[in-house]
Amino acid sequence: MNKICLKYLLLPWIKNIPKKYISNLKMDSRTLTPGDLFIAVPGIKKDGRHFIVQAINKKAAAILCETKKKDKHGIFKYIKNVILIYFFKLSENVSLLANRFYKEPGKRLKIIGITGTNGKTTVTQLINQWSTILGTKTATMGTLGNGFYNSLQPTNNTTSSPIFIQLFLSKVLEKQAELVTMEVSSHGLIQHRVKEVPFYIAIFTNLTQDHLDYHENLEKYESAKWLLFSTHKVKKIILNADDQYGKIWLKKLLNFYTVAVTIQNRKQKKYSTKWINATNIEQNNNSIYITFESSWGTGRISSCLIGRFNVTNLLLSLACLLELGYSLSDLIHTSEKIIPVQGRMELFSYVKKPTFIIDYAHTPDALKKTLNAIHSHYQRYIWCIFGCGGERDQKKRPIMGAIAEKMSDKVIITNDNPRNEKEKKIIQDILNGCKNKEKILIIPDRKKAISYAYFGAKYHHIILIAGKGHEEKQIIQNRSINYSDKKIVLNLLGKNI
């Protein structure tokens, strides 16, 4: 990459900086190379300002250091020939700096931002998949990875760092991407990671209890999600208007371009610019058929995705693609080509073997909707295997225990990612929500729990494995070990095929 002048980069904020050229922007001192600009800001776990000495020793070209004092903004000094510049509210401006450094890549792309408690990954991947089928070069950023369809690179965060986001947009633009779908987490919004991303469309899936370990309460969590629609650059907004928050937000956004997405609920369309409403849903074992009416016309799409929540996910994706200018006829005719998203209601069904369903459901609402979907499609004996993550929202644990007990025939409580929390404490928290202990088994080892269910189930039974979905690691204490629900399931089924 060509070097950029630090004086030019900082011009919108600081005027008197000496001419100096930098190669890259870095927030992690471990990845620094000579000539980089080190951006030292406080984080949740570590403070980048504590690593300034390492940055100097690694021959950073310059250092930007966050200061809480407004009068220190723009002051600079030299330490071992490295310029250190104080920057007021630097954390809030990293996205803007990165956007300027990478020459505003978002302006030459159509970027779709998807937020919500559940469904972000599915909608992100559906739009990616559907648009790719129709010939568009679409890149994606999110939980399943970053990149183009079928070539995603693993990622640690749902929403990446503000620097990486702009770098990614720059790289996919070089590879002739036209469209980018991006999961936008509440953490990413509060931490200003997408502040300078020009979203063409923002989509809201739903809002239910999650991340209360971080946000403290549902009101603060709602406020975080609302930031995407209230303070960010968005041209069009698509809302799940069946969701209680979606309904409220639709009325708050009367002066904006909105699309209301509903199931058998025409009342919300009077508050929106455009709308789409499912009028009839037909379900069988492995398929769903959705008849709809909309501002673009009427039609019927078919899909192998199951569950009422996936009707909403499909309609949100359909509305987005219609707003992007795709033809309704083309979308209807290609809907049946869409395949399930990895780790989201992912089905493994073989003759005379129990049917496995792997799903990422890790919130009370998601678990309830997943079990509802299984009931409506299969009407069979259901095993539910799940746990809850350690060092995360503890309030949801008994609620999820109650849901699993009520909606399943047999429940196995196991480990999810216990992290540094005691597994017995997590399991007991879940058990506190359960009344009928006779239908519940405790098998902390997740692999053993899945094996027990497989060998104990009859061929017509359904075994739901909830919570980890696509994940290929399990975090126990400070160790991240190789682990995959899917690999265990395929191994079990393969032994007897």
Swiss-Prot record:
Residue sites binding ATP per the record: 116-122
Species, as recorded: Buchnera aphidicola subsp. Acyrthosiphon pisum (strain APS)
Name listed for the protein in its UniProt record: UDP-N-acetylmuramoyl-L-alanyl-D-glutamate--2,6-diaminopimelate ligase
Organismal lineage: Bacteria, Pseudomonadati, Pseudomonadota, Gammaproteobacteria, Enterobacterales
Binding-site list for UDP-N-acetyl-alpha-D-muramoyl-L-alanyl-D-glutamate: 29, 157-159, 185, 191, 193
Keywords carried by this UniProt record: ATP-binding, Cell cycle, Cell division, Cell shape, Cell wall biogenesis/degradation, Cytoplasm, Ligase, Magnesium, Nucleotide-binding, Peptidoglycan synthesis
Chain positions recorded as meso-2,6-diaminopimelate binding sites: 392, 416-419, 467, 471
UniProt xrefs under SUPFAM superfamilies: MurD-like peptide ligases, catalytic domain, MurD-like peptide ligases, peptide-binding domain, MurE/MurF N-terminal domain
Enzyme nomenclature, EC number: 6.3.2.13
Disulfide bonds: none
Signal peptide (residue range): none
Residue span of motif Meso-diaminopimelate recognition motif: 416-419
PANTHER family hit by this protein: MUR LIGASE FAMILY MEMBER (PTHR23135), UDP-N-ACETYLMURAMOYL-L-ALANYL-D-GLUTAMATE--2,6-DIAMINOPIMELATE LIGASE MURE HOMOLOG, CHLOROPLASTIC (PTHR23135:SF4)
GO MF, one annotated term: ATP binding
Main localisation: cytoplasm
Name of the gene this protein is made from: murE
Pfam families per UniProt: Mur_ligase (PF01225), Mur_ligase_C (PF02875), Mur_ligase_M (PF08245)
Post-translational modification comment from the UniProt entry: Carboxylation is probably crucial for Mg(2+) binding and, consequently, for the gamma-phosphate positioning of ATP.
Cofactor section: Mg(2+)
Catalytic activity: UDP-N-acetyl-alpha-D-muramoyl-L-alanyl-D-glutamate + meso-2,6-diaminopimelate + ATP = UDP-N-acetyl-alpha-D-muramoyl-L-alanyl-gamma-D-glutamyl-meso-2,6-diaminopimelate + ADP + phosphate + H(+)
NCBIfam families per UniProt: murE, PRK00139.1-1, PRK00139.1-4
Positions of modified residues (N6-carboxylysine): 225
Record family assignment: Belongs to the MurCDEF family. MurE subfamily.
Protein's cellular compartments: Cytoplasm
GO terms (BP aspect): cell division; cell wall organization; peptidoglycan biosynthetic process; regulation of cell shape
